[in-house]
């Protein structure tokens, strides 16, 4: 799947939004990719997961024991990646601010885990979710995501990173907003509390 085909999937789902958005990282953007909208169509979600799975090296796919994703945003694509790879898929969640396994999910000691996210911007949620996996005895061997939104900042997740598409929409600190954003109220569309 080419980058243009991937973005066409987002456009077809009305998931490429334009406005003034406050991202979970605390930065502002004129554009937002609402992955929940692109993933609500099960056939589209399956196509995107299959394309993402195809980006992984064969040796890595063979080594993976389990797919883990952080709730909320990663749950659907994590499940679809599990399906595409023929591996079980679970998720971590943060009921009190720290990711943890719940709902009876367990990770076998030493299990090779693929972390799967919808969007990675700073990598903070990914690193926090990886800590929960390690605390439960798993070994995170790589991360995959639908969208790398890091704008070429070379985020360090500590493991190989395989995004389906890299999008470099400009982001701004609150005190660096361009005039077209400064005059409008920001909408916070994500599921995580905004970083301080």
Curated annotation (Swiss-Prot):
Enzyme Commission numbers on file: 2.4.2.10
So what family is this one in?
Answer: Belongs to the purine/pyrimidine phosphoribosyltransferase family. PyrE subfamily.
Q: What class of enzyme is it?
A: transferase
Catalysed reaction, written as an equation: orotidine 5'-phosphate + diphosphate = orotate + 5-phospho-alpha-D-ribose 1-diphosphate
Which residues of the sequence carry a binding annotation for orotate?
121, 149
Q: Report which gene this protein is encoded by.
A: pyrE
Which GO BP terms, alphabetically? Answer: 'de novo' UMP biosynthetic process; pyrimidine nucleobase biosynthetic process
Recorded GO MF terms:
magnesium ion binding; orotate phosphoribosyltransferase activity
Q: Which organism is it from?
A: Sphingopyxis alaskensis (strain DSM 13593 / LMG 18877 / RB2256)
Task: List ligand-binding residues for 5-phospho-alpha-D-ribose 1-diphosphate.
Answer: 117-125
Mind listing the UniProt keywords for this protein, alphabetically? Glycosyltransferase, Magnesium, Pyrimidine biosynthesis, Transferase
What is the recorded name of this protein? Orotate phosphoribosyltransferase
Q: Which NCBIfam families match?
A: pyrE_Therm
Question: Superkingdom of this entry's organism?
Answer: Bacteria
Q: How does it assemble?
A: Homodimer.
Q: In which pathway does it act?
A: Pyrimidine metabolism; UMP biosynthesis via de novo pathway; UMP from orotate: step 1/2
